[in-house]
Amino acid sequence: MKVSKVRVGLVGLGLVAASHIRAYLAHPDAEVVAICDLDAARAEEIAEQFGIAKTYSDFDEMLGDGEINTVDITTPTFLHAAMSIKAARAGKNILCEKPFCLALAEGQAVCDEAARAGVTLMVGESYVFMSSIMKARALIDTGEIGKPQQIRQRFGTWLERPGAHDTERAITDTHRGWRLDTSRAGGAGFPWMFDHCVHFFATAEYLMRDARIKDVYALKSDIGWMHEDRDHAPDTSETHMYRPETAGDIPIITWTYDDPACQGVWMRAEALNGKYDPMFGFSVSVIGETGMIEVLGEGGRGLAWQGRDAHLVLHRKGGETQSFCFDEGGDEIWQSDVSYYSRAHKNQIGEFIGALTRGTLPRYTGTDGLHQVRTTMAAICSAKEGVPVRLADVTDARYSREA
């Protein structure tokens, strides 16, 4: 639904909310009209911090505010679908954080309701809006590495920036602990994977020039040894946000695309699953016919070329290697060389605002968000069943089945 100015009501004041609010406030075509949270005191605190006039502790009441034409949903995953449907029925445009939904049926219901209501629906897939990742895609699009054929993703230890917004809150805090609860975060026993894999798969398709993933094979390993063997216990001395799943660890995921020449792998080696990788956070290598790109993502640190820190390195077959840095002030949450919370969310929300004021579809729609949930479900099904899983064969019933 096209609007001349985006007037936002944001619901859910957890870790990512401040990044969204700052992005709206920095844009000339947007205004944050109100914020909403069950914790009324927190809502008042955030409203005072950012100069927001209205606060609500009831989502339905906020939807009745005629000044609001757009709703930004940054609540825990189990609330996404119901809130999105209510917002669509109230005639509000919607930006819903990832993961889009807990089940395929409810995600499809949201897409259908938004279409019926004639409102715009975007899913908040911020990884594909990181400056470093977008630069990698631009280099691929201009043919710098030839046809991209393989994605290699590394997932190392993430370190929070001491004193960063919200990081003083314990992991069990209401605003953070939901990500470890499969009833609220999803994952059928793998809540961390469900919350994050949508990012990894979205990036894997984006850097393969939007080629769709066809099937997924995930390796599950038992984590009993982490508790039994003191010499190999995971390092919990740093301010890590997450821990291995109680259902087991998924350290490796592989996938193929519709194009049989293309494939990908994600590998997790960090302190929380008892491993060491000198590369921090998320990073990606894209291997093409005539070159390769190495690029940092969320929480990324440790990439270098010729003794200098780099955010992206472009290797050309038989040609010059080139490195890039993006001077965006680092990250407000992670001890990272690249800006995720600050810049990626600003880029994403800029795309959303632009789509609304132009009356066009945003770059990442509800259909895209639903597809990445399906891909993540395929990975979890594969880990539980021990077999490769085709996306076309994933159903809510299969995903929810006990291993």
Predicted regions and their residues:
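N-terminal Rossmann-like dinucleotide-binding module
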Residues: 1-50
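C-terminal helix-rich "cap/oligomerization" subdomain common to oxidoreductases
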Residues: 1-2, 70-73, 338-340, 347, ...
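Beta-loop-alpha module in the N-terminal Rossmann-like domain of NAD(P)-dependent dehydrogenases
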Residues: 20, 39, 50-113
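Hydrophobic residues in well-ordered beta-strands that form the structural core
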Residues: 95-96, 121-123, 152, 295
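Rossmann-fold dehydrogenase core element
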Residues: 109-127, 146-150
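Predominantly a Rossmann-like dinucleotide-binding segment in NAD(P)-dependent oxidoreductases
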Residues: 127-244, 386
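Contiguous beta-strand/loop segments that form the cofactor/metal-binding neighborhood of enzyme cores
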Residues: 175, 199-306, 346-358, 376-379, ...
